[in-house]
């Protein structure tokens, strides 16, 4: 059985990590390269960089950053945010990103999923889905959760797999940033609809929440602030999960 993965997410703006971190032993906690290296050294399984600037003129900064990160870390890393076309996705992968995460662009042009998958393999395509319940149904939202697409989550999950995605990054809009726990109802809803790995996102606040996400059917759990502010220690989290019967990678912990 594949090990469950713990993923740290970094919001990057103009080549710097924003939303703050609390690592006293880092010279510069705003440097994504240094922070990425640090996370890879303490046992985080994967990194996600979200480019929240995501404008054309700032793209060069992100490309240079991806190259630097690729040289420094030895864990998979995904880049998302503002990837609107095949050219941008392609350039990020060629510069060293292991995967790209697409969201709004995939909804507006689903053929983009297929193009990236055919060129670089399904494993390089993560489709990020932001969803919440509307009138009793899980519905897909785009533009950072602002636009209700009217597309039902169940239909989009099936199409995403059919189009060639390798993974789904499932974010509960209602849980994001609350630290109230992952939306296990949504994870359980999506699990039987797809064979793709599901990354749970939105709501991590304590170690039990990771366990709940995995028990609900998630293959990976993503978090940001609980790691950045050291509210949860990666070693303790993995040992806790192992103790509760979850298969996690313990190599590389420190």
From Swiss-Prot:
Cystine residue pairs: none
CDD domains the UniProt entry points to: HisF
Residues annotated as catalytic: 11, 130
Superkingdom to which the source organism belongs: Bacteria
Listed EC numbers: 4.3.2.10
Keywords of the record: Amino-acid biosynthesis, Cytoplasm, Histidine biosynthesis, Lyase
GO cellular component: cytoplasm
Subcellular localization: Cytoplasm
Swiss-Prot/TrEMBL catalytic activity: 5-[(5-phospho-1-deoxy-D-ribulos-1-ylimino)methylamino]-1-(5-phospho-beta-D-ribosyl)imidazole-4-carboxamide + L-glutamine = D-erythro-1-(imidazol-4-yl)glycerol 3-phosphate + 5-amino-1-(5-phospho-beta-D-ribosyl)imidazole-4-carboxamide + L-glutamate + H(+)
Entries under InterPro entries matching the protein: Aldolase_TIM, His_biosynth, HisF, IGPS_HisA/HisF, RibuloseP-bd_barrel
GO BP, sorted A to Z: L-histidine biosynthetic process
This protein's pathway: Amino-acid biosynthesis; L-histidine biosynthesis; L-histidine from 5-phospho-alpha-D-ribose 1-diphosphate: step 5/9
Catalytic class of the enzyme: lyase
GO molecular function ontology, one term from the record: lyase activity
Its biological purpose: IGPS catalyzes the conversion of PRFAR and glutamine to IGP, AICAR and glutamate. The HisF subunit catalyzes the cyclization activity that produces IGP and AICAR from PRFAR using the ammonia provided by the HisH subunit.
Record text on subunit structure and interactions: Heterodimer of HisH and HisF.
Family: Belongs to the HisA/HisF family.
Protein name listed in UniProt: Imidazole glycerol phosphate synthase subunit HisF
Organism of provenance: Thermotoga petrophila (strain ATCC BAA-488 / DSM 13995 / JCM 10881 / RKU-1)
Designated gene of the protein: hisF
């Amino acid at each position: 059985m594949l090990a469950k993965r713990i993923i740290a997410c970094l919001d990057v703006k103009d080549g710097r990590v924003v939303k703050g971190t609390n690592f006293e032993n880092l010279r510069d906690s705003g440097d994504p390269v240094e922070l990425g290296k640090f996370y890879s050294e303490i046992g985080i399984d994967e990194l996600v960089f979200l480019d929240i600037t995501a404008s054309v003129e700032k793209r060069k900064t992100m490309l240079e950053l991806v190259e630097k990160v690729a040289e420094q870390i030895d864990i998979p890393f995904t880049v998302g945010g503002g990837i609107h076309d095949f050219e941008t996705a392609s350039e990020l992968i060629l510069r060293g990103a292991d995967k790209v995460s697409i969201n709004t662009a995939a909804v507006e042009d689903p053929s983009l999923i297929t193009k990236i998958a055919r060129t670089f393999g399904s494993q390089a395509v993560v489709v990020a889905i932001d969803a919440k319940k509307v009138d009793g149904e899980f519905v897909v939202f785009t533009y950072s959760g602002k636009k209700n697409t009217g597309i039902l989550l169940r239909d989009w999950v099936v199409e995403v797999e059919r189009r060639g995605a390798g993974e789904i990054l499932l974010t509960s809009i209602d849980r994001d940033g609350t630290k109230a726990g992952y939306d296990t109802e949504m994870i359980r809803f999506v699990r039987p609809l797809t064979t793709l790995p599901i990354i749970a996102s939105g709501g991590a606040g304590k170690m039990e929440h990771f366990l709940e996400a995995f028990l609900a059917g998630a293959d990976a759990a993503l978090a940001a602030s609980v790691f950045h502010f050291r509210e949860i220690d990666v070693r303790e989290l993995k040992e806790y999960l192992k103790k509760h019967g979850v298969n996690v990678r313990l190599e590389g912990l420190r």
